[in-house]
Amino acid sequence: MRKILAAVIVFFLVSVNVFAEPFSGVYKTMPSKTTGGWAHVKFGACKENKNFTCGTLIKAFSRDGKAVKNYEHQGKYVVWDMRKEGDKNFSGGKIKDYSDGKVYNSKMEILSKNKIGVSGCVLFICQAQEWSKVK
């Protein structure tokens, strides 16, 4: 009985590890083309569906690198509903550009331990950025 219980516990621990959120951390966005400011986005499991990855804007910076106090979009999703597709790719999600208020279809790719590629597309026109890991 103990061996069966031990096997079940080991299986459960391995299963949790396999399905654990594969992508997390805080990333610095590229500077905005319109304002020159950038943000720190914290990635993790979405609150609404833990199987998807979301990115929350946790801090905004002005062109000169100073933190923007009481930024109106702080705490909101920038990226949401990303589904894991293979080891390094995510798709099916959305990304919001708060400088113009538009929402785009989005994909992400883990480029290295400290960089991700994020793209937003309308039809077949896409724009991509590389974001660097902060934490």
How should these model regions be labeled?
Residues 4-14:
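Sec-dependent N-terminal signal peptides
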Residues 23-99, 103-105:
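Central antiparallel beta-sheet cores of small beta-barrel/beta-sandwich binding domains
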